[in-house]
Amino acid sequence: MSQKIIFLEGDNIFTSTKQVKIFGQNSPIKVNKYIFAMSLCNEIKKDELEKVKALLSAHETTFTPNLIITPRLGTQSSWSSKAQDIFKNVGIKSVQRLERFKAFDVKDKEKVLIKSFDKMTESHFSSLSDTKKIFQEAQRKKLITYAIHEDSTLLDKLNNDLGLALNDVEKAYLNKLFQKLNRSVTDAELMMFSQINSEHCRHKIFRSKWKTDIPFSHDSLFEAIKSTTKKDMEHILSAYHDNSAVIKANGASMLEVGGDDKYKNYKGEVDTTIKVETHNHPTGISPFEGAATGSGGEIRDCSATGRVARPKAGFMGLCISHLRLSNELEAWEDKENKPDFLASPRDILIEAPIGSAAYNNEFGRPAIFGYFRTLEYQDLGFHKPIMLAGGIGSIKEVQIKKGIPKPGDAVIVLGGPAMLIGLGGGSASSSKKTNDNADLDFASVQRSNPEMQRRAQQVLDKFNERSSKNPITFIHDVGAGGISNAIPELAKDTNLGVEINLEKIDSADQTMSPMELWCNESQERYVFTIPMKKVRALENICRKERCPFSIAGLLTEEKVIKIKFHDDEVVNLHLDDLFGEIPLPDLIAQYYDLSLIHI
């Protein structure tokens, strides 16, 4: 029996003001409306349909669109999962799945697609009847293997095609490793290795030794940074080995909900987490989402400090090239000379602060200040911007030190489902930028869902309220490289191995290959370990907070990363091979005396 799908028409997508802002006075859009598509599991009754219409502020469709933008084929949008959750809670049982489309009657489709279409998360159609395809089951992509142990030159091609950003030393290391193992490498192992060993994750430039023609008294840039901490250790409780630093607070307190569901002041010692990080590459490609997910990642860094902490306030900063606000250039400005795939400094300045502030606000944390500055000299400048996301939080003194997990402990993935977004973000942000890899760059930009992060934080807060009885032994946020970086890092830090079953991990995209499931950078996720006997308590909290979680696998005594998906062995690598000591490059810095113009 064919699936029954009904369509309802909702409100306008854009206000008239927003439409002019996006498309100008000569907008190609004649009509723009949200369309709600519902796949029914049985015949919907009249009173149930009226309840649906009231919830969605919708009615029968009144126009015929010639452009419909939907979630990408094979995926379920975050809006859909939230809406279905609401339908379930108010007793609507006939709707199997609900999706929201952007529907237009347009004069010029291409103009609308350029401004309103995200090719990583959306598909587009010319008629409503064609959109029924998104409710059909799609075929999953397969695991791919490459015989680099037989052909050492193959890795050069893969490095370029997959955007791995491996240097010659790393390629030689991989070739030698798989010749020793005498087997092919999987695409998941390649992508995982490239993320874990990217500049973004391993900070190779900061850890390398520099040769300079001016005095430099430290072995590396990291040593220079750390030397400032050594001068005042009295107030620093934790630095450089966790997701954020912890400094001594002066009589701070923490309001929390007790076991009786009443607010109370925590009476123990409370200290302060502090963190800044950058999210440059994504902000340069897509300023709003790049800055939003930059702030989201910094929030997760705070939460995943020690055994759990609570974010309190955030801030952001931007360093960009000259703004060129009008056709009349200022005395210090020349004609723009940036790569085509990067957003303009003007667009970054307008969109990035809104993205960061929006994420903070929707999560429920104030963004309290920020800064921006410009720098450009001849052909050099912040064409690729610096986007700095920072924040402070509160942490109980008893939670500052991470616990000691044991073999057999459950490995939990908490938060939103896996989606094909942000693939290869660690290596993309670490590679040389050209117009040739613009599609790979766009694929590496994450998409934000601050509501899901708030749900995850509510779960962590419940464990935080248990203070010394918090069952979480070790926690990492999921950032660059996704769980393919977070879970191996957790294994390395705990000196244990891990066995993961990818089938267990929540996914909103049924077409994703094992590599994509393992390596995507879907946001708003954490990985942590917890004794198996405490999983029931976690389940109860997650149900109350409506936050998804998966028991992804178990810690093992054998220091090996083993990842399976049905009958596929996706990853099988020893920790020593994955985190091998790869020689760092020697870097050279030369001093230049710049002749600056007077204005």
Which residues are covered by each model-predicted region?
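Core nucleic-acid recognition elements
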Residues: 1-434, 438-466, 474, 479-483, ...
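Conserved NAD(P)+-binding/catalytic subdomain of aldehyde/semialdehyde dehydrogenases
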Residues: 469
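A structural-propensity feature for long, helix-poor, extended segments
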Residues: 510-516, 522-525
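Repeat-solenoid scaffold signature
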Residues: 526-545
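Structural signature of cysteine-dependent C-C bond-forming condensing enzymes
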Residues: 497-501
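Catalytic PLP-binding core of fold-type I/II PLP enzymes
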Residues: 490-493
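Short alpha-helical "recognition helix" segments of helix-turn-helix
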Residues: 599
